[in-house]
Every structure is written in structure tokens, then in C-alpha cells.
């Protein structure tokens, strides 16, 4: 009896609708001579209508792994870029943004590889690819991939494609673009409108080396 009474009082305190569920009974406590009235539930209360609805949106293990990578921030082998081509302040495609992509890839190639993620800002916030997608009226993903391949072709030539693994993935409802860059077995230069540039990853930045620095680095890096 104590259990049902406790249950009744508990539900009453939380304002559950139990008026139709209660019943008044005569209850004789052991050792007492006179019974007393007690309100209890006729049956154990059904919690079903108060259950929290199940979460219908689920996320894959892969998404959590990507989130962990992003939360880890930038480093010697990880770089984030907000966009592939879109200049957030100018609100249009801009060559300086493309050049930033190219120099990061070059630095990873000339060092020990790395991961470039587009659609994430410097504060590890996932922005998605909508700014880049808005540059195209249709076939947005296809045109995005085409734009990336053109960046590779224009700044490097297609010879480095074998050193890149890239794709678009979804992370908690937002799309990001990753480029997994493998280290190169030879020096790779960025062709910046006829000017050859040599980049190396130093800490969390892609550093431009002058001629003397580049020569010394190449000799040391690929001396075997």
C-alpha cells in the first residue's frame, strides 16, 4: 500500500492528470483499532503519454569523427578555410581565396602531408559550403568539384591529382569539403600567374620560401 500511496503523491506533485485514476479506500494500519481513508491509484500509473519522444535525427560515427577533428583545431597537418572561392567580404568569387587554397596544398605536399578542410573557420566553427554553392544556379556540387579541379589545374597542373584525396561530407547538417594531401616525393611549386612560389608548412602556417631557403630545403628534404 505504501508504494501506491507514494506513487500517487509523486504524480500529484508534478500535476499529472490522475483524477480519473484515484480511488478512496479504507486502510487499517497494523496495531491500530480504527481504519482511515486513503486516496491511492487504482493501478500503477501509465507513463506512456509522458514519455520523451525518440530522437528521429541520427548522426553517423563518421560525423562524430569529423567533429572531433574540427574541435582539435588547426595544426602543422591540419588547416581550415571558410570557403574555396567565395570572398566573404567582397561577396563574390575571388582569386586571392583560390590562391590561399593552392598555397596550403603546396605546403602540405612539400612537407609531410596534411588535411585541408573547407567550410570551417579559424575558430573551428562549421560554416558549410553554402557561400561557395551560391555561386552556381544549378548542379552546385558538380560545379564546386569542377572549380576545385580548375584550381589544381591552374596552379599546379594535373600531375599532383594522385597526391590528393578529396570529397564532400555532411557533418551535423552542414556540408564540408576535405582535401587529404599526401607528401610529395619531389618539390612542388605554385604557378601564381607565371611566378613560381615554394611553400612549406611551418607550425600552423604555409610559409613562402625565397630562392635560397627553397634550395636549401629541397636539398635537405629530398637529399636521398
Residue ranges and their predicted role:
Residues 1-224:
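Conserved N-terminal catalytic/coupling substructures associated with nucleotide/phosphate chemistry
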Amino acid at each position: 500500500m505504501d508504494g501506491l500511496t507514494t506513487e500517487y503523491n509523486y504524480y500529484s506533485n508534478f500535476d499529472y492528470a490522475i483524477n480519473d485514476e484515484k480511488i478512496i479506500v479504507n486502510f487499517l494500519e497494523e496495531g491500530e483499532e480504527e481504519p482511515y481513508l486513503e486516496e491511492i491509484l487504482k493501478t500503477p500509473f501509465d507513463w506512456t503519454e509522458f514519455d520523451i519522444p525518440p530522437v528521429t535525427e541520427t548522426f553517423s560515427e563518421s560525423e562524430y569523427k569529423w567533429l572531433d577533428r574540427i574541435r582539435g583545431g588547426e595544426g602543422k597537418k591540419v588547416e581550415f578555410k571558410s570557403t574555396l572561392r567565395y570572398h566573404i567580404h567582397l561577396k563574390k568569387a575571388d582569386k586571392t581565396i583560390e590562391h590561399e587554397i593552392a598555397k596550403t596544398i603546396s605546403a602540405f605536399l612539400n612537407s609531410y602531408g596534411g588535411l585541408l578542410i573547407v567550410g570551417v573557420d579559424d575558430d573551428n566553427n562549421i560554416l558549410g559550403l553554402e557561400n561557395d554553392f551560391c555561386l552556381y544556379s544549378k548542379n552546385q556540387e558538380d560545379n564546386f568539384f569542377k572549380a576545385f579541379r580548375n584550381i589544381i589545374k591552374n596552379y599546379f597542373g594535373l600531375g599532383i591529382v594522385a597526391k590528393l584525396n578529396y570529397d564532400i561530407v555532411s557533418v551535423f547538417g552542414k556540408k564540408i569539403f576535405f582535401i587529404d594531401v599526401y607528401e610529395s616525393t619531389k618539390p612542388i611549386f605554385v604557378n601564381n600567374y607565371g611566378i613560381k612560389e615554394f611553400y612549406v608548412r611551418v607550425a600552423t602556417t604555409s610559409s613562402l620560401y625565397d630562392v635560397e631557403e627553397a634550395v636549401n630545403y629541397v636539398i635537405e628534404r629530398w637529399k636521398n
